[in-house]
Regions:
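Conserved alpha-helical segments that form or flank metal/cofactor-binding pockets of metalloenzymes
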Residues: 34-72
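Hydrophobic stripe of amphipathic alpha-helices that form coiled-coil interfaces
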Residues: 23-26, 30-33, 56, 63, ...
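A structural signal for well-ordered alpha-helices, especially hydrophobic packing surfaces
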Residues: 13, 20, 27, 46, ...
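Charged, amphipathic alpha-helical segments and their flanking helix caps
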Residues: 36, 43-54, 113-130, 134-139
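Disorder-to-helix initiation segments
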Residues: 1-12, 89-92
C-alpha cells in the first residue's frame, strides 16, 4: 500500500541527496577539454536534482510520512555512494550514467508500487523523472561517444 510507496520514496530521497552532492563535486572539480560544456551541464543537473529532492520530500509529506533531513541518515541507506577526486569529464559522465541506470530502475519500482496503491500522483511524478532521465542518458552517451570528429 501507501506505506510501501513512502518507504521507497525515502530510499529515493537518500539516493538523490548523495547524487546531488556528487554532481556539485563534479561541477567544482572538472578540468580539461570539456570544462566549459560540462561545468555548465553539471550545474543544470544539480539544480534539477535539488528540485527533485524537494518534490520527493514533499510527496512523502503528502502521503503522511516524514522525510529524513540529516545527511548522516542518508548515507546509512543510500545505494548511491559518495564520489570524490573526479576531475576528468569522462569519469564524471560514466558515474552519472551509472547513477541514472540505478535511479531509473528504482523509479520504475516506485511506479509499480504506486499503481498497486492507487497512487496516480506518485506514479505520474516518477514517469516524468523517467522521461527526463532517459533523454539525458541518450544525450550523455552521444556526448561521450569516442571517435567523433568535426570535418
Amino acid at each position: 500500500g501507501v506505506a510501501n510507496v513512502v518507504s521507497a520514496l525515502h530510499q529515493l530521497l537518500a539516493d538523490f541527496q548523495v547524487y546531488y552532492t556528487n554532481l556539485r563535486g563534479f561541477h567544482w572539480n572538472i578540468k580539461g577539454h570539456g570544462f566549459f560544456v560540462l561545468h555548465e551541464k553539471f550545474e543544470s543537473m544539480y539544480d534539477d536534482a535539488a528540485e527533485k529532492v524537494d518534490e520527493i520530500a514533499e510527496r512523502i509529506l503528502m502521503l503522511g510520512g516524514v522525510p529524513e533531513n540529516k545527511f548522516s541518515e542518508y548515507l546509512k541507506v543510500a545505494k548511491i555512494k559518495e564520489v570524490s577526486d573526479v576531475a576528468c569529464g569522462s569519469d564524471a559522465v560514466s558515474n552519472i550514467l551509472e547513477t541514472y541506470g540505478y535511479l531509473i530502475g528504482e523509479e520504475r519500482k516506485i511506479i509499480e508500487l504506486a499503481n498497486e496503491a492507487g497512487d496516480d500522483v506518485t506514479a505520474d511524478l516518477m514517469t516524468g523523472y523517467l522521461k527526463e532521465q532517459e533523454k539525458m542518458v541518450w544525450m550523455l552517451v552521444a556526448f561521450s561517444t569516442k571517435g567523433c570528429t568535426d570535418k
